[in-house]
Amino acid sequence: MKIGKFEIRLNSQLVLLCLIVIIWLCFGIVNPNILSISNTYSILSSALVPLMLALPQMLIVAMGGTDMSFTVISAISSYITLRIWDVNGAAEIPTIIIILGAIAIGIVCYLINWFLVDRVKISTFIATLGVNSMLKGFVLAFVSSSYVNSLPSGLKAFSTSALATAVNSEGVEYVLHISIIFVILLYILLYFMMEKTMFGRKIYSIGADEDAARRAGINVSRVRLFAFILAGILCGLTGVLHDSLSRFSMPLPPDVVGKELNSIAAVVIGIGGSKKASGIVAGTFLGVILLQLVSSNLVMLGVPSYWQQFVSGIIILIGLAFQAIQVVKKAKR
């Protein structure tokens, strides 16, 4: 039985990977420059923040919920930390302090989510939607609406760190940012946590059937607490990465806040038509890459934004349909 489940998960991800390759080649037929190394670097670099943003959502979805606060928490965790540094006029501060400050704020925000979900018994979607709105008002009313234009030197240096560079046919240089290593390592660690540890299995069990998990002796409240804390840590890291790459910080950046559905779509594509979330980490990675591939290349082809949204929606439906068919076929065997 375990082997059968593994095969379903593998085929689901394999179909998604094949879909990415097919779409990439189709774009390449229309415009051969899309297949270039420089464009690949551009897509991967633009996918860094979406890849990080999808991780806290992935954890909540694995437990059977939907998080609507992760984008705001990611944005304000870094902004508040940098704003405090900026207001105090500190000449310099170690990057690790900024990271730890952002992580601490992310954890506090998710502890609020946990309290509302676990103690007050509000659904995850409603609770996080309320926290989303509350935090937006809080940061603008009590912190600031001003930009932080000058970042600590450590973040400035990190923002210009390149793993590789490539020049396109027009002489424009594209950079593959070094943080791609960190993002990939983080996905690998979370993959092993979710698939190979007891904690990951407990998360899957809660997502499949919370009451059954409780009857099986799983401390649902404790597992949810640690999962929410981990989501807060991921949001803090995401916020710092975003601000470093942007080279400034603002309270509610439009390329983060309001992008909840993009991350939800990536996670949904990742788990495919399966009723269970197993294999969600690898699936989420591929889901983000698929959406970023479509979005970036449509921009390169000069397609209007409303058509980009339409095509992205079609791609999501096709990806889910293929994966659902694979699951049904396996279930009949």
Model regions: which residues?
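Alpha-helical transmembrane segments within multi-pass membrane transporters and channels
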Residues: G89-N132, L286-G287
